[in-house]
A protein has these predicted regions:
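N-terminal accessory segment at the very beginning of proteins
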Residues: 1-247, 252-255, 262-268
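Short, intrinsically disordered, charge-balanced linker/junction segments flanking boundaries
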Residues: 271-274
Length: 274
């Protein structure tokens, strides 16, 4: 009886991970997570709860064909490697929840989701059901207090290093939110989700929040220099074409004019100066 129970437990554990083509799949307790190579030295992570992962993309281009190194290490651990980046997927015995850690080619930790469980019932992937089949989703990562974070678009704030900042993930008249950053640890991260939300770059944890979404979706790339990381990002989302010649030159730009006389004064001054 005891032997049969051990065999049954082993069969259940073995169902956590599977290799599906060029992707590593995790399934447990209604959650499905898919990790796959997405351009050079990069991995894309998608996940859902009680549904199938949706195909398609918001910003990422279709990846070029490439082979990933996938290893099912044991019942509770699997890895997937693409060039300079490796993801280690581990099932934690308490609660059987997944934790993903990203390493560079030297085996150094770049980024790691938080550990699950404990008295606070913490979860790296926290789904909160909403009406209509969507979720409010929070994804949490461990934070290196010495890490420096750069990017995220244009915000009305004075800090170049975003460590310690809280940012709204939404476009406004005074801000352009681009949820991608470059880390001083040697990686780039794209929150591939169009939902309005928030990001908190704390010194203890980094938390991404999507207020309404169907699935988890983020992309991580590794590089030896910021320029290499930016190059991977450009390859993943598409490179900006050269502006046509007729669009080059001086642009007269002002947020607003209060009346017609202000506009005419500008026009008169241009005419005066030739």
């Amino acid at each position: 009886m005891r032997l049969e129970r051990r065999v049954l437990e082993r069969e259940v554990f073995m169902q956590y991970f599977e290799k599906q083509g060029n992707a590593l799949i995790f399934r447990q307790d209604g959650e499905t997570v898919r990790v796959e190579p997405w351009q050079k030295d990069s991995l894309r992570v998608r996940g859902t709860l009680l549904s199938e992962i949706e195909e398609g993309s918001i910003a990422l281009l279709d990846p070029e064909p490439m082979e990933a190194e996938i290893e099912l290490v044991d019942e509770l651990k699997a890895t997937i490697k693409n060039g300079k980046i490796q993801a280690v997927l581990e099932v934690q015995p308490w609660g059987q929840k997944l934790r993903i850690t990203f390493l560079n080619q030297k085996g150094e930790v770049l980024l790691s989701e938080i550990a699950n469980g404990g008295a606070l019932c913490l979860r790296a992937h926290d789904y909160r059901a909403l009406k209509g089949g969507a979720y409010q989703l929070k994804v949490s990562f461990d934070s290196n207090p010495d890490e420096k974070i750069y990017g995220m678009g244009q915000y009305q704030q004075e800090r170049m290093n975003l460590k310690g900042c809280n940012l709204e993930l939404a476009h406004r008249n005074s801000q352009a939110s681009i949820p991608f950053y470059v880390s001083s640890l040697g990686y780039g991260f794209l929150w591939h989700n169009a939902a309005v939300g928030e990001v908190h770059f704390g010194t203890n944890t980094t938390e991404w929040l999507a207020r309404t979404t169907k699935q988890l979706d983020y992309w991580v790339t590794a590089g030896d220099t910021p320029a290499e990381i930016e190059e991977h990002f450009a390859d993943a989302i598409g490179k900006v074409p050269m502006m046509p010649e007729y669009g080059l030159g001086f642009w007269q730009c002002k947020l607003r004019y209060y009346n017609q006389e202000q506009v005419l004064n500008v026009a008169r001054e241009y005419k005066k100066r030739g």
